[in-house]
From Swiss-Prot:
One example of a Gene Ontology biological process annotation: DNA replication checkpoint signaling
Family designation: Belongs to the timeless family.
Pfam entry (one): TIMELESS
Lineage: Eukaryota, Fungi, Dikarya, Basidiomycota, Ustilaginomycotina
Main location: nucleus
Polar residues bias: start-end ranges: 1141-1159, 1168-1178
Protein name as annotated: Topoisomerase 1-associated factor 1
A single Gene Ontology CC term: replication fork protection complex
Length: 1251
C-alpha cells in the first residue's frame, strides 16, 4: 500500500545519518539536465561502484589461525567498520534509488551479483547494533537499505508492464524475472544469519534496538524520526512476509528444497522475538491516536500471513506421522479421520492412495486415447487408413487404432477436428494472493494461538479503523482499491475462522458432555453405595458448579452483524461487476457468503435475543429490492473467469437460496421492495427553477417505494439460467484438476439439483456441449475417480446425471436435433396483457388533471379520441337539456289545466313530482365500427384516464371491448363544464413549468386477487393488426416511473361530488344486484318525501286555497297544529323506512286524511292560477341556451339530495343564479313563474333551516 520512500523521508532528517561523503567521487549522482540514456551507467559500472562502497563500510577482522581437522583456517574475531561507513551506506541507498526510473533494474541485479546484502549489510547490522550511538546509526542505515532491497516485487507482472509500454530490449527485461529468486535468497539469509557470538539474529536486532525503544515512547514525546523508524521496521516485516516460498517438486534443487518452508521459519522467528505480539498490540489499539498511524501496515502484515491459506489448515490443524504435536483444540475423531494420507499440495487436503492411483490411471488412459503417450514403434509403422461412415477416407496414426472399431475411430477424428486451442485457465484472478505452501506443525500451532487472541481482541478494532480510513481516503493506505479488497479478504478469512472455531468448540463441548454423562452414571452408582451424609455433601458440591461459559460468543464479531456490512458487500458487488473488477468482485462475494453463514449460525443459536437479531438482519436485507437483483446478477456473471471466481459463484448459489428458502418458508407472506424507476432528471438531481420549491419538496416526500409479494418459487425459477448451468458444467470439469474438496463437489451437486429438480428446468443441461461432457463422465472412468475423492457426493452426482440424460432421451427427435445443433427451442412468446392504468399525481386541480390527460393524448397524436369523448359529452348534455325543458313544458301545461277529482289529482301529483333526473338514461359512447378507437378505449391508459376524469363509466366485461357511458346522475351543467375544460386545453395546452407530462402521472396496478392471475391476459385474436402490446409509454420506456399498489378506486371523484355534479362516485361500474325489499322501500320513501316537501312548501298558498276555493276545508285546517308534532316525528324516523312498516293507528289515519285534503286544495290552487294566466306556452329552448337550466336543475337536484348533506349545503351559494334565471322567465308567464320561483325559494329556505 505504501511506497518505498514513505518512511525514508523521515529518516533523512536525522543528523546522525548525514555525512560529508561525496557521491561525486564515483560520478553516479544524478544532476539536473543529465538524465539522457547516454549518461546512464551500465551494469558493470554500477557493480564496480557498489563494490567500492561496500569496502568503505567495513569488513571482518581475522584473528589468529586455528586448527580444524588438521588444517589451519583464519578465525573471525570481530566486525570492524570504516570511518566512512555511514556515508557509504547512504550512498548505497541513493544508488539504489536509481532503479526507480530504470525498467531493467540494473542496480538491483548488480547488488544481487555482488551479494551486497549477504557480505556487507547483514554483518554491519548484526555487529553494530548496540555498540553506542554510531553503531546504532549504522544499524539504522542498514535496516533502511535492507527494507528497500526486500520490497515486494513481481517479476512477471513487471515484464508484462514494460512490454506494454514499448520497451524492446527483451534481453535485459528478461533478467528482471530472476529478481524473484534473489528475494527468496535474501529472505533465507536474513532468517539464518547470526552474529559472531551466535546471540543475535536480524529480526531480534531490529526488534530490540530499533522498534521497541521507539514504540515504547509516549505519543506526545514521539519525534518524527521515531515515527519513521517504527514504520520502517513494520515495512521490513511486511516485505519478508510478502515473499512467497518457492514451489518445489521432486526434481527441484537442494537449495530450492531448503527454502520451501521459509514462511514457517519466519513465523516461528517472529513469535520468538515477540513481533507477533507487537502486531497484536497494534491491532487492538488501532483506534487510538497513539497507534492509529500504523493500522494499515499492521493489516498488511496480517494479510500476508493468513490470506492465501485455507482456513481449515489453521483452525483445525491435523498432522500425520509420529512425533508431531497435535492441536489442543482438535477432536480425536477429526484428527483420526484426517490423518489417513497427505499430499504435497497444502490446500488439497489429505487424499487417499487409492484416489491418487485412480487419478493417475485415468490420466494415462486419456493420454493413450489422444495418442500422446509414448509408444514403441513397430518396423512397419502405425498408420492405418479407414473409410468412415460418411464415406470419407481417414487416417489413424496410433497403435490403439488397431483394436478400435471404425465408428469409434471416426468419432475421435471428428472430435479432433472440432477441438479448438484453449488458453490456459487461471486459478486465481489477477492480483490475488498466491496460495501458500504447507505450514509446519509448530508454525500452524503458533498461528492458531495467535489467531484466537486476534479474533478476541484485535480483529474488530483493526477492521473498523481501516474501513474508516478507506472512507476518509487516507494517503497511508496507498491504492484504495487494493486496500478495500484486502480488508474484505481479511474479514472473510477471520469470520470463517470464527465459525470453524465455534463449531469445533461446540463439538468438543458435546463430546465432553457425553463423556461426563457416562462418568456421572458411574459416580451416581458409587454415591448410592455411600453413607447418606456423604451423599448430601457430594450432591451439594455438584450443584455448586457453575455453568460453562460459551467459548466463542457472537459478541466477538458483533461489528460484522450490523446492516452496514451487508450494504457494503452489496454495493461493492454491484460496482465491481459494472467495472469488471473481478478480484474485488470475488472478495465481496466471498465476504457475502461468510456473512450469510454467520447469520445462519446466529439464527440457530440457543439464545432468543441472538435469534431475534438474526431475524431482523434477514428481514432488512431481504426486504431491499437491490438484494435479490444483485443475487440474480451474480448467478449470471460467469463467462471465462478463473476457477476462484467460479468457486465463489457456485458457493454463493449454494448458500444464498438455501437461507432464503428457509427464511421464506417460515412466513405466510413475505414482501420486498419493488423496483423504483426514477426519471432521468431526478436521477441527476435537477430541480425546476420555475416551479414552487415547496411544492417540489412536498412531491418528493409523497413518493414512497412500493412493495410486492415475494415468492421463493419465482426466485428459484429465475435462478435457473443458462449462465449458471454453464458455470456448473465448467466447474465440474475443473474441480478435479484444481484439487477440489468434497465440500465443493457437494455444493455443486446441490446447485445442479436446484436447477434441474426444484426449479424443474433440466433443459438448461440439454445443450450438446453440456450433455456430451455429462455422458463422458458417467460412461468413462471419471466418475470413479470422483467417487474415490468424494465418496458421499459423487453417487448423488451420478444419479443426477442419469436423470438429466433420461429426460433428454424422452424428447422428440425434432427437439433433440435442435439441442444437438447447439441451440435451445424458442420459447412461446408471452401473451399480451392489459397495460397498467395511470393516475395524475396528487396536488393538481380537477381541471389541471384533465389538461394532463388531454396533453398526453395530443402528444401521442390521438386527437380523434379526444374529440370522440368531447362529442359524446355534448350529445349527452343536449339530450338531457331537452328532457329538462320538456319537463318544464309539461309542468307549465299542468299549471294551466283545471283541477279534476281527487283521484285524478293524486295521479297528476305523482306525475308532477317526478324528477327530470329520473328520466335521464346512461348515454353509451359508440365506436361506429372504428376498431382502432375501440382498442384505444380499452387498452390505452391515457385515454382511459381522460374518460374517468370527465366522469364516464366503463363496462369492462370484455377485455378488448370496453363500453364507456355517461352516467345518468351527471347533470348537463357539469357536462358543459367538462366540455369547456377540454376545449380550453385543446386550444392552450397545460403549462407544466418545464416538466414532462409523463412526470405528472404514475402507474397504478390493481391488487392481486387469488385465482385471477391470468385475468388481464389478452387474446391476440381480439387485437387489431400491428398492436404489439406497447400502446402506452408506461409500458414502453418507463416514463411513468412510480408504481404503487392500488388500495382505492382508479380515479377518485371526490372533487366532482363536491361540486354537486355527481350523486355518487364515478369509477368502475359495479355489478348490478337484484332488487330487494329494502330497495323498494327506499324508493317508496323517496316518493313520500317528495310529496311531503311539496305539501309543506308554503303555508300561505295552502291558506289561500282554503279561503278561495273550498270554504268547507277551513274546519279541517284547525287540525294543522295538532299534526305538527306528528310530522316532526315522521321526519326524524326516516331511518326506519327500511324496516317493517308498523300497523297504522287512528292518529296516523287522521294525518293521512289531512295530507290528502291538503294535496287536493293545493291542486285546486294551481288550477285557478292556470285559468287566470292566459299567457302563451314558452317554446322549447335551444341546447345552446344553457343558462335557463340552472334553476330547474337546482330544484330537481334538491328533491333527490336528502341522502347527501354535503351536496345540499352547496346550494345556498347558487341561489342568486336561480333568481336571475327566474327573472328571464317572467316575460312569458309572470304569474306562473313567480309562483314557482316563490315555491322553490321557500323550499330551499326551509331545508336550510332544517339543516
Amino acid at each position: 500500500m505504501a511506497t518505498k520512500d514513505d518512511y525514508s523521508e523521515d529518516l533523512e532528517n536525522d543528523a546522525d545519518l548525514m555525512t560529508d561523503f561525496s557521491d561525486d567521487e564515483y560520478g553516479y549522482r544524478h544532476e539536473e539536465g543529465h538524465n539522457d540514456e547516454e549518461a546512464a551507467p551500465n551494469i558493470e559500472e554500477i557493480r564496480e561502484a557498489a563494490a567500492d562502497l561496500c569496502n568503505q563500510i567495513g569488513e571482518y577482522d581475522y584473528g589468529d589461525e586455528h586448527d580444524w581437522d588438521g588444517e589451519q583456517y583464519p578465525r573471525l574475531k570481530r566486525w570492524k567498520h570504516r570511518p566512512r561507513a555511514l556515508g557509504s551506506l547512504r550512498s548505497l541507498r541513493k544508488l539504489w534509488k536509481m532503479d526507480d526510473d530504470d525498467p531493467t533494474r540494473k542496480v538491483a541485479r548488480a547488488f544481487a551479483e555482488n551479494e551486497v546484502l549477504q557480505h556487507t549489510i547483514l554483518p554491519a547490522l548484526l555487529e553494530s547494533a548496540g555498540q553506542g550511538k554510531e553503531g546504532d546509526a549504522i544499524a539504522l542505515a542498514c535496516t533502511d537499505l535492507l527494507t528497500a532491497m526486500t520490497w515486494p516485487f513481481d517479476g512477471l507482472e513487471e515484464l508484462r508492464e514494460q512490454e506494454k509500454q514499448g520497451h524492446l530490449d527483451l534481453a535485459e527485461l528478461s533478467e528482471i524475472t530472476l529478481l524473484d529468486e534473489h528475494l527468496v535468497n535474501y529472505k533465507s539469509v536474513i532468517l539464518r544469519n547470526r552474529s559472531l557470538d551466535q546471540q543475535h539474529d536480524v529480526l531480534g536486532v531490529v526488534m530490540r534496538y530499533l522498534l521497541l525503544p521507539n514504540l515504547a515512547t509516549k505519543h506526545h514525546e514521539r519525534s518524527t524520526l521515531a515515527t519513521g523508524i517504527i514504520s520502517m521496521c513494520l515495512h521490513l516485516f511486511r516485505n519478508l512476509l510478502a515473499i512467497r516460498d518457492p514451489v518445489t517438486t521432486s526434481l527441484s534443487s537442494v537449495e530450492r528444497l531448503s527454502n520451501a518452508n521459509l514462511q514457517s521459519e519466519l513465523i516461528l522467528s517472529m513469535h520468538k522475538h515477540h513481533i507477533l505480539d507487537a502486531l497484536l498490540m497494534l491491532s487492538s489499539s488501532a483506534e487510538t491516536q497513539a497507534y492509529n498511524a500504523w493500522n494499515a501496515v499492521a493489516s498488511e502484515c496480517i494479510f500476508h500471513i493468513f490470506v492465501g491459506t485455507m482456513v481449515k489448515t489453521i483452525a483445525e490443524p491435523t498432522f500425520s506421522g509420529s512425533g508431531t504435536r497435535m492441536s489442543h483444540d482438535s477432536t480425536p475423531n477429526a484428527s483420526a479421520s484426517n490423518t489417513a494420507g497427505s499430499s504435497s499440495n497444502a490446500n488439497a487436503g489429505p487424499i487417499s492412495s487409492l484416489a491418487e492411483s485412480l487419478a493417475m490411471e485415468t490420466k494415462l488412459k486419456r493420454a493413450s486415447a489422444s495418442g500422446k503417450i509414448a509408444t514403441r514403434h513397430s518396423r512397419f509403422g502405425t498408420t492405418i487408413n479407414f473409410v468412415g461412415p460418411d464415406g470419407e477416407l481417414r487416417v489413424a496414426r496410433n497403435q490403439a487404432a488397431l483394436i478400435k472399431p471404425v465408428a469409434q475411430l471416426a468419432d475421435e477424428a471428428n472430435q479432433k477436428g472440432r477441438r479448438r486451442a484453449q488458453r490456459r485457465k487461471d486459478a486465481q484472478e489477477k492480483g490475488a494472493p498466491k496460495l501458500k505452501s504447507k505450514w509446519t506443525p509448530d508454525a500452524a500451532l503458533v498461528l492458531q494461538e495467535w489467531a484466537d487472541t486476534f479474533v478476541q481482541s484485535g480483529f474488530e478494532p483493526l477492521a473498523k479503523s481501516v474501513l474508516k480510513d478507506i472512507r476518509s481516503e487516507r494517503d497511508k493506505l496507498g491504492d484504495l482499491d487494493v486496500a478495500r479488497v484486502r480488508i474484505m479478504q481479511l474479514g472473510a478469512f477471520f469470520l470463517e475462522y470464527f465459525l470453524l472455531r465455534r463449531t469445533t468448540a461446540a463439538k468438543r463441548r458435546n463430546a465432553a458432555k457425553t463423556a461426563g454423562s457416562v462418568q456421572s452414571t458411574f459416580a451416581q452408582r458409587a454415591l448410592d453405595l455411600q453413607e447418606p451424609d456423604e451423599q448430601h455433601e457430594r450432591s451439594g458440591q455438584s450443584a455448586e458448579q457453575p455453568e460453562e461459559a460459551e467459548e466463542w460468543p457472537f459478541e466477538l464479531v458483533s461489528q460484522w452483524l450490523e446492516p452496514w456490512a451487508f450494504r457494503m458487500v452489496l454495493v461493492r458487488t454491484i460496482q465491481s461487476q459494472e467495472t469488471k473488477a473481478w478480484l474485488e468482485f470475488v472478495a465481496s462475494v466471498r465476504l457475502w457468503i461468510v456473512l450469510l453463514r454467520l447469520v445462519d449460525e446466529l439464527a440457530n443459536s440457543k439464545k432468543e435475543s441472538e435469534r431475534d437479531v438474526a431475524e431482523g438482519l434477514q428481514a432488512e436485507f431481504y426486504y431491499m429490492g437491490e438484494t435479490l437483483e444483485a443475487c440474480h446478477a451474480i448467478f449470471r456473471s460467469y463467462t471465462t473467469q478463473s476457477f476462484a471466481f467460479l468457486d465463489a459463484i457456485i458457493a454463493f448459489a449454494y448458500v444464498m437460496p438455501k437461507m432464503l428458502e428457509r427464511y421464506a418458508s417460515n412466513r405466510d407472506h413475505m414482501y420486498v421492495q419493488a423496483k423504483k424507476q426514477v426519471h432521468r432528471s431526478r436521477q441527476d438531481g435537477d430541480l425546476d427553477t420555475d416551479q414552487d420549491e415547496a411544492r417540489q419538496i412536498k412531491e418528493q416526500l409523497q413518493e414512497t417505494r412500493s412493495e410486492r409479494e415475494f415468492r421463493f418459487a419465482d426466485f428459484q425459477r429465475k435462478l435457473a439460467t443458462k449462465q449458471l448451468a454453464k458455470a456448473c458444467i465448467v466447474y465440474l470439469r475443473r474441480w478435479k484438476d484444481n484439487n477440489g474438496t468434497e465440500d465443493q463437489l457437494n455444493e455443486l451437486v446441490t446447485v445442479m439439483h436446484r436447477i434441474a429438480i426444484k426449479a424443474n428446468d433440466y433443459r438448461q443441461f440439454f445443450l450438446a456441449t453440456h450433455r456430451d461432457y455429462l455422458r463422458f463422465m458417467i460412461s468413462g472412468d471419471t466418475i470413479s475417480a470422483f467417487e474415490a475423492r468424494a465418496p458421499t457426493s459423487a453417487p448423488n452426482l451420478r444419479k443426477l446425471i442419469d436423470y438429466i440424460l433420461r429426460k433428454f432421451s424422452k424428447l422428440s427427435p425434432e427437439e433433440q436435433s435442435i439441442y444437438n445443433a447447439g441451440k435451445q427451442p424458442t420459447r412461446q412468446p408471452k401473451p399480451p396483457r392489459m397495460p397498467a392504468e395511470i393516475v395524475v399525481r396528487p396536488g393538481m386541480t380537477p381541471d389541471q388533471e384533465i389538461g394532463v390527460a388531454v396533453g398526453l393524448l395530443l402528444k401521442k397524436e390521438k386527437m380523434p379520441a379526444v374529440l370522440w369523448i368531447k362529442s359524446a359529452l355534448e350529445m349527452a348534455s343536449a339530450m338531457r337539456t331537452e328532457l329538462v325543458l320538456r319537463y318544464e313544458e309539461e309542468e307549465a301545461q299542468r299549471s294551466i289545466q283545471g283541477a279534476g277529482d281527487d283521484m285524478m289529482l293524486l295521479g297528476e301529483l305523482e306525475k308532477h313530482n317526478e324528477s327530470p333526473v329520473e328520466r335521464f338514461q346512461p348515454y353509451e359512447l359508440a365506436y361506429h365500427g372504428n376498431d382502432e378507437l375501440r382498442t384505444d378505449a380499452s387498452l390505452m391508459p391515457e385515454l382511459k384516464l381522460l374518460c374517468r376524469l370527465v366522469g364516464l363509466e366503463a363496462n369492462d366485461n370484455e377485455l378488448v371491448n370496453w363500453r364507456w357511458s355517461v352516467p345518468k346522475e351527471i347533470l348537463p351543467v357539469h357536462l358543459d363544464q367538462k366540455i369547456e375544460t377540454i376545449e380550453r386545453y385543446i386550444r392552450e395546452p397545460l403549462d407544466t413549468h418545464g416538466r414532462e407530462l409523463t412526470a405528472l402521472v404514475m402507474r397504478i396496478r390493481k391488487p392481486r386477487v387469488a385465482g385471477e392471475a391470468d385475468a388481464d391476459v389478452l387474446d391476440p385474436a381480439d387485437l387489431p393488426d400491428g398492436w404489439n402490446g406497447a400502446q402506452s409509454d408506461s409500458d414502453e420506456d418507463g416514463d411513468y416511473f412510480d408504481r404503487i399498489r392500488a388500495s382505492r378506486s382508479l380515479v377518485s371523484a371526490d372533487h366532482v361530488a363536491a361540486e354537486g355534479g355527481l350523486l355518487r362516485r364515478s369509477g368502475p361500474k359495479k355489478k348490478l344486484s337484484h332488487p330487494t325489499k329494502g330497495d323498494g322501500s327506499r324508493k317508496k320513501k323517496q316518493i313520500q318525501r317528495i310529496k311531503q316537501d311539496i305539501i309543506d312548501d308554503s303555508d300561505d298558498e295552502f291558506a289561500f286555497a282554503l279561503a278561495d276555493l273550498q270554504p268547507q276545508a277551513r274546519t279541517d285546517a284547525d287540525a294543522d297544529s295538532s299534526s305538527d308534532d306528528k310530522e316532526e316525528e315522521d321526519d326524524d324516523d326516516d331511518n326506519m323506512d327500511d324496516q317493517e312498516t308498523p300497523a297504522t293507528s287512528s292518529v296516523a289515519d287522521l294525518q293521512e286524511q289531512f295530507d290528502q285534503g291538503k294535496s287536493n286544495a293545493l291542486d285546486a290552487l294551481r288550477t285557478a292560477k292556470q285559468q287566470r294566466s292566459n299567457t302563451e306556452q314558452p317554446p322549447l329552448q335551444d341546447a345552446g341556451e344553457r343558462i335557463n337550466r340552472r334553476m330547474d336543475t337546482k330544484r330537481l337536484f334538491l328533491a333527490d339530495s336528502d341522502e347527501d348533506d354535503d351536496d345540499v349545503l352547496a346550494l345556498s351559494s347558487q341561489e342568486p343564479a336561480d333568481i336571475s334565471a327566474t327573472s328571464d322567465r317572467t316575460a312569458t308567464g309572470p304569474s306562473v313563474w313567480a309562483g314557482i320561483a316563490k315555491k322553490r325559494r321557500l323550499a330551499i329556505l326551509d331545508d336550510e333551516d332544517e339543516d
